[in-house]
């Protein structure tokens, strides 16, 4: 994989002004973004998140998943902490793409869960790759991470690429009546680390 740094600009948000760093995977043509806030230290643990693109959740306010809620919570947590990063990776639909994601949603509307829908379309449950994170983190100067995630695959990927995960910070937000079954499937079939408290909450 060849990751090329392209440019950096300011990104004003409701939580403060982030810096937006653009990267291109010259082999696949995919474009990725790193958001940074404050001053990042290579010597100290930095609060951060690896976030895969979710057009429906991040931009269209879908309640079928928790992605948009997690992105906003991560940005708010980083701003409140005073520094941090988000790697926004272009891996829509756990790597199957937007149109296939819509096809998977159609199958879910007919009763399949999120894993079954992917498999019925001929895909693995999760096809995301994380080999781009190392060169991006090197560019923004991060070596030690407090990682906001419920996904053990992201923790494993960080460690495999030589990035120290000092702490896993749970990010359990956004549960509602439309996504509760989806979240339970992520917990039971994809191994996401969610507490029973998250499912006992009756605020839907």
UniProtKB/Swiss-Prot annotation:
Pfam families: GTP_cyclohydro2
Binding site for Zn(2+): 54, 65, 67
Cofactor note: Binds 1 zinc ion per subunit.
Functional note: Catalyzes the conversion of GTP to 2,5-diamino-6-ribosylamino-4(3H)-pyrimidinone 5'-phosphate (DARP), formate and pyrophosphate.
Superkingdom of the organism of origin: Bacteria
Presence of the UniProt keyword Isomerase in the record: no
HAMAP family linked to this entry: RibA (MF_00179)
Binding-site list for GTP: 49-53, 70, 92-94, 114, 149, 154
Catalytic site positions: 126, 128
Catalytic activity: GTP + 4 H2O = 2,5-diamino-6-hydroxy-4-(5-phosphoribosylamino)-pyrimidine + formate + 2 phosphate + 3 H(+)
Protein name: GTP cyclohydrolase-2
GO BP of this protein: riboflavin biosynthetic process
Organism (species): Shewanella baltica (strain OS155 / ATCC BAA-1091)
GO cellular component annotations of the record: cytosol
Gene3D superfamilies cross-referenced by the UniProt entry: GTP cyclohydrolase II
UniProt entry keywords in alphabetical sequence: GTP-binding, Hydrolase, Metal-binding, Nucleotide-binding, Riboflavin biosynthesis, Zinc
Protein family (similarity comment): Belongs to the GTP cyclohydrolase II family.
EC number: 3.5.4.25
């Amino acid at each position: 994989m060849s990751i090329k740094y392209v440019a950096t600009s300011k990104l004003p948000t409701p939580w403060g002004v982030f810096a937006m760093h653009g990267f291109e995977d010259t082999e696949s043509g995919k474009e990725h973004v790193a958001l940074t806030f404050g001053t990042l230290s290579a010597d100290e643990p930095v609060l951060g998140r690896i976030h895969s693109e979710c057009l429906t959740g991040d931009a269209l306010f879908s309640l079928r998943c928790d992605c948009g809620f997690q992105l906003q919570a991560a940005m708010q947590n980083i701003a409140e902490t005073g520094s941090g990063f988000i790697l926004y990776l272009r891996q829509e639909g756990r790597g199957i793409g937007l149109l296939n994601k819509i096809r998977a949603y159609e199958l879910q509307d007919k009763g399949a869960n999120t894993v079954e829908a992917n498999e019925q379309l001929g895909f693995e449950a999760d096809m995301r790759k994380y080999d781009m994170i190392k060169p991006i983190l090197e560019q923004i100067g991060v070596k030690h991470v407090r990682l906001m995630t419920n996904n053990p695959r992201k923790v494993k990927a960080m460690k495999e690429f030589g990035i120290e995960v000092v702490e896993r910070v749970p990010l359990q937000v956004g549960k509602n009546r439309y996504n509760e079954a989806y979240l339970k499937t992520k917990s039971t079939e994809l191994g996401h680390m969610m507490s029973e408290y998250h499912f006992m909450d009756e605020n839907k």
